[in-house]
Amino acid sequence: MRMAPTESTEGRRLWPGPREGGSGKETTSEKLSNLPRPHSYSPKRADAESFRGVPAAFKKCREVFRACWGSRELLFLFKAISEAGPAQNSCGITLEKAGGLEDTGSHWLSWARCKVLYINGFTDPWKDAQAWILIVSCKKGKGTPEREGRN
């Protein structure tokens, strides 16, 4: 049985852009909690299973993402994407900001949550995109983006 789209998702994106602001109807955590998850969730299993049945282009990019996993460089990429909108790389993968970057004081930008979209090149790019969620953690870093001259 197919459910009708709810008011919160009908006619607009689930995650508003950085300059749009939210409608005030749902919090970010409520939106993220509505995402499908396996019943027996574990980070290790999720990492292994998240790339099953996905397009070859996404598999090619997996190693690139893993190489940057937990690094500050990837968080700077997310910062740029969140300010400039979606950015697409040569493999056809688009990263779009979904949850935001959280500053926890002693840990500068401790985590980022981004929606990863695979764009099908033979159809309308935004209609038939398949989405995954990528959660990236960042270790406590020395310095700040201002000190490193990157913001």
UniProtKB/Swiss-Prot annotation:
Residues 1-48 are annotated as: Disordered. This is Putative uncharacterized protein LINC02902. It comes from Homo sapiens. The lineage of its organism: Eukaryota, Metazoa, Chordata, Craniata, Vertebrata.
